[in-house]
Amino acid sequence: MLELVFDSKGTKLYNVCINNKKRRKQIMSVLREDFLWGGATAANQYEGAWDADGKGASISDMCTNGSYTTPKRVTPIFEENTLYPSREATDFYHHYKEDIALAAEMGFKCFRMSINWTRIYPTGMEETPNEAGLAFYDHVFDELGKYGIEPLVTISHYEMPYALVEKYNGWYSREVIDCFMRYCKTIFSRYQDKVKYWLTFNEINSGTMPMGAILSLGAVKGYCGPVNEVPDEKQIRYQALHHQFVASAKAIKYAHDNYPQFQMGCMCIFATKYPYTCNPDDVLLCQKEMRMMNWFTSDVHVRGYYPSYMNRFFEENHIVIQKEPGDDEILKEGIVDFYTFSYYMSSCESADSEVVEKSGGNLVGGVKNPYLKASDWGWQIDPKGLRYTLNELYDRYQIPLMVVENGLGAYDKLEEDGSIHDSYRIDYLRQHIAQMEEAVKDGVDLMGYTPWGWIDVVSASTGEMAKRYGMVYVDKYDDGTGDLSRKKKDSFYWYQKVIKSNGEDLD
């Protein structure tokens, strides 16, 4: 018996035998031929060499280590006998050739990374860039090019120059827009023939939460203390976010006008939420939280204007966004070409204050879903939520999507023979990739997939090394010790097979 197989546009591909158990491997791959398989990193968690070759201090360099139970701290001055894990991180700066060779061995088509702003402009305020910093990224992009790997570059990924925090209170000051544009123009010009895909800000919607005032906005001048105890100053955060919106739009318009070969995207945390029950109060609360957390910053980047639902939020929270003439026009002219997001977990929302069992999360949590398992850090594992999210995003925006962060933070055991058996990570990735492919069958236009921390990096939320995501193990520990050697985990070989088969072989 034969079955007709069609693509998403209804075009007949060919016939297959429905009784064949290997049917999946006989039909055309669900994913496009040029699908961007790869992995994701960020300079502030991976690069290290925090003061090498003229680099300045970023806000990440001023954050101490922490753990699941003890939050990391931000300190305005360096404290003796305190570990600042981002300063060495896992030392991509001195291992980039080795690491890119490992990525190539896995079959990467795409390498998501960020440029460290303070490596190019140490304080963010210089008129002339740091040539040593520019040369470093030349070497990185050339090495990627040698293997035919496409860089996907985040311009600002939680590494605002600390000097801008001290002078301007970070993005709260409009002055920082000009500093950012100088930085963008420099790297666009320098790498115009080496980089095609750009993201302006990492997880820009983190600025809607108090902790985002440190990580993303740098709007914490003079603050010293745990990152989870930052004052909830909404007026400051949303004004700072407006300045980031304007900066992002200006950078995108400048790129479109001067480098038409560039593809410009945005990047958001997507914290998928479900109503805890079918009680209308839960449904309305879930809708509100989805808007505040996920849709607001996404709508501005893709549609080019503030959504109407924010008016009530601003009014009820006494927030007045100071705009300059022309800001609204800038937002309209600087919309993105594609949309990227991180997806790790989902959570529930309940209007019932007696529902108290909470879930952990990547900066944002919620009520625990009784139908889901959780990671060692309390992040609920929801592969089908990724399919749901992709469908919701594509239905809303109708532009290409890319999953640029996804993965399982876990405790890995290094065996005596040097092996790392991480079947739990393989299982997590397998389930999410399978649901990603289901979304493509649903009609979603998906560009690529870069799981987070393909090589072990410092955790952004906790500042620890014990929370490992990588398919490559790095010998580095929470106390700062380790020889930084690299070892392949079982997941390395599994992902290599997945890429080679373009997602057909997930066994």
Each predicted region: which residue ranges?
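Short, Lys/Arg-enriched N-terminal segments with co-localized hydrophobic residues
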Residues: 7-27
